[in-house]
Amino acid sequence: IAVVASNGIDTLSSGFSGCYMASFRHNGIRYVAHIPTPNNSIKTSWNLAVKNRIIDNVVLFKPTEGLARIPGTIGIWGIITFNDRCYRLDVNENAPPSQAIRGQRIFNSIPRNPILTEIPPIAGGQMP
């Protein structure tokens, strides 16, 4: 699990293919996490932390869930805003005019299509 303290700021993570993104509080500090799903022990540990209230104020979503991939998309990113709104960002390398930066490369986003989609969080904060 990749975790960053993110008090008061929007957080973006890239490379979603089935992973989850979450925000939560632990010892009064707000964090955002990118959680891989192939590993059942991670899923079990996460669900236990939520159930046992080791973490609270949990907002969990899956950027790839329930939406068709927009043609030309080379990557799906997740965004959780400072006020826990969840978004999926479809990124395309070949279409101007908007651009997104990833590492040392600049990727163009898809024009004329809705590329930023708000996703409802998963109720209860546990992975199914």
Show which residues each predicted segment covers.
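Active-site microenvironment for binding and transforming phosphate-containing groups
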Residues: 1-128
